[in-house]
Swiss-Prot record:
Belongs to the mycobacterial PPE family. SUPFAM superfamilies: PE/PPE dimer-like. This is Uncharacterized PPE family protein PPE46. InterPro entries: PPE-PPW_C, PPE_dom, PPE_sf. The lineage of its organism: Bacteria, Bacillati, Actinomycetota, Actinomycetes, Mycobacteriales. Was identified as a high-confidence drug target. One of its GO terms (biological process) is response to host immune response. Exhibits vaccine potential. Immunogenicity is demonstrated in BALB/c mice. Immunization with this protein induces a significant number of CD8+ T cells and a strong Th1-type response, with high gamma interferon (IFN-gamma) and low interleukin-4 responses, and activation of the bactericidal activity of macrophages. Identified T-cell epitopes may contribute to immunity against tuberculosis if included in a vaccine. It comes from Mycobacterium tuberculosis (strain ATCC 25618 / H37Rv).
Amino acid sequence: MTAPVWLASPPEVHSALLSAGPGPGSLQAAAAGWSALSAEYAAVAQELSVVVAAVGAGVWQGPSAELFVAAYVPYVAWLVQASADSAAAAGEHEAAAAGYVCALAEMPTLPELAANHLTHAVLVATNFFGINTIPIALNEADYVRMWVQAATVMSAYEAVVGAALVATPHTGPAPVIVKPGANEASNAVAAATITPFPWHEIVQFLEETFAAYDQYLSALLSELPAVAWVWFQLFVDILGFNIIGFIITLASNAQLLTEFAINASYVAVGLLYAIAGVIDIVVEWVIGNLFGVVPLLGGPLLGALAAAVVPGVAGLAGVAGLAALPAVGAAAGAPAALVGSVAPVSGGVVSPQARLVSAVEPAPASTSVSVLASDRGAGALGFVGTAGKESVGQPAGLTVLADEFGDGAPVPMLPGSWGPDLVGVAGDGGLVSV
């Protein structure tokens, strides 16, 4: 890189360039723009910091909140750094503008240089017998001073602008918030799966269709002027109530009208066939792409739904006390008695409002529960007002689901179909109603 030699040019060049330049207005406008950008960056960073802090404090919970915070914390830091860089850039633009103003103030002006040249010309013109030798020397020395001053001012201005240019920070690119390449694979597969629109197939089908019906279309177009004239004559005959003329015109042109009608019907059929064929091609293309793309889009969606639903179902099972259901035995034994014995109640009758037997004795210790809780109900076991029979199958099995109140059910659960009118009098192993 070569640096300009300011001393090699006369001061008129430097003074003219500085005076005729755009001035410091553009630099000051750029500095104001950088200052506004710095303030905007700072405001956005502050607002986003509040949001990220709220999310991190627990407004959201789960992996999504963690990913949000992890993605936006670097972006907030970049906003803060960008605000500082913009403020620094504004300051450097102000420094460059100030350097320009100082250089313009220190630079010898064009009127001063012109006055020096005019004085030198007058002194030289009136230098009779060398009387102006000393003034001419002083004038030339003053011009040399302005020459050196102009070169010095330009060197200082170059140093100030170069330092401002070097000190101006360059803001790096913003960090990526959305994970790059997250959907590239699925998009590539979907793009490879989607077939292009069948323009060529449609054009080929239409060409074949028009070729098949071309003779009818040509005949229809050739007959159209004559048929139009015939219809005009018939219309005039109708308006003039010329029945005889109408019949004569219609009879003399019957063959033409018949051929025109036949050709028109063929063309209409061909047009409908072409429209139906194009619709069929487009529908087949749409359905084929749907069957190819929907599984690609539905797979990740169903996987996400399953991942979200399965933990929820497991949590509900834990709340309901079904986290550890006992396994059903491989083979069920003989049905065990639902109630071992029922002691008679005083008076022999229980109030109709009683819902359960008043006193129940547990089954003998030697009887084991061989049937565990099933997913099927007891079913219809009888009606109110009927007596139980030994030949009828009795309810078998106890509900032994464990919960925080105990390890098993101390009292057997009666079927829900038994109404509140049951009494507590035992009769041959059955329940008797009143």
